[in-house]
């Protein structure tokens, strides 16, 4: 995968989490993986079309999701994954994908993003094709977020 795209992804994730949650995230070492493993119970998927075809996939635990929602609501404690919480989780992914789209535009790759899809449950599996980049992220605790960028073409 083009290093400029990897750097755009890392920058987008870092800036979005910092600006939206008010927390300086630590990004782990990006790596190319053969398939997407979902160790957590909550997933946000956003499609990417245009100059790059693929998906941006966030995953984290329900506990981490509630911390994200609380931070997005200005620190107000939130303790249930209701429609409002799931909408906020989707919006975090949407903001990350939007920032990535702007950075890709500067690289000459015009992309559009789909609305986020949020899925929760156990033993989630996602099948994706193309090159898959995994980026572990530490926000509230060690590697509590996983991010995957799956690129079928254009990357």
UniProtKB/Swiss-Prot annotation:
Q: Which GO terms describe its molecular function?
A: hydrolase activity
Tell me which EC number(s) this protein carries. 3.-.-.-
Coiled coil (UniProt feature): none
**Source organism's superkingdom?**
Bacteria
Q: Which SUPFAM superfamilies match?
A: CheC-like (SSF103039)
Q: Could you tell me the keywords of this UniProt record?
A: Chemotaxis, Hydrolase
Q: Which Gene3D superfamilies match?
A: CheC-like
Question: Tell me, what does this protein do in biology?
Answer: Involved in restoring normal CheY-P levels by dephosphorylating CheY-P. It has a greater activity than CheC.
Name assigned to this protein: CheY-P phosphatase CheX
């Amino acid at each position: 995968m083009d290093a400029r795209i990897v750097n755009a992804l890392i920058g987008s994730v870092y800036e979005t989490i910092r600006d939206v949650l008010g927390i300086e995230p630590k990004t782990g070492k990006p790596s190319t993986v053969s398939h997407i493993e979902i160790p957590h119970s909550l997933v946000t998927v956003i499609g990417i079309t245009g100059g790059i075809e693929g998906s941006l996939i966030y995953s984290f635990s329900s506990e981490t999701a509630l911390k994200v929602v609380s931070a997005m609501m200005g620190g107000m404690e939130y303790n249930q994954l209701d429609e409002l919480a799931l909408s906020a989780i989707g919006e975090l992914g949407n903001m990350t994908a939007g920032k990535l789209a702007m950075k890709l535009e500067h690289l000459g790759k015009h992309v559009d993003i789909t609305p986020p899809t949020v899925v929760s449950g156990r033993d989630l599996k996602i099948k994706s094709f193309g090159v898959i980049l995994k980026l572990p992220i530490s926000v509230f605790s060690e590697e509590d977020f996983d991010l995957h960028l799956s690129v079928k073409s254009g990357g």
